[in-house]
């Protein structure tokens, strides 16, 4: 099963990626400091993915 909580350990070349997107220095540093946690839960054919960080929280639910 994929149920569980996952925490970002590292993101190689993330600064270069953000710079290529055109983000300024301050915004890039804020984004780099975020360490999101993703919680995945499955109930039958329903899936929920919750992402939480200091910058933004999101939740996506869907059925397969």
From Swiss-Prot:
One of its GO terms (cellular component) is cytoplasm. GO terms for molecular function: lipid binding. InterPro entries: Calycin, Fatty_acid-bd, ILBP, Lipocln_cytosolic_FA-bd_dom. The keyword Disulfide bond does not apply. Keywords: Allergen, Cytoplasm, Lipid-binding, Transport. It is found in: Cytoplasm. FABPs are thought to play a role in the intracellular transport of long-chain fatty acids and their acyl-CoA esters. Belongs to the calycin superfamily. Fatty-acid binding protein (FABP) family. Forms a beta-barrel structure that accommodates hydrophobic ligands in its interior. This is Fatty acid-binding protein. It comes from Acarus siro (Flour mite).
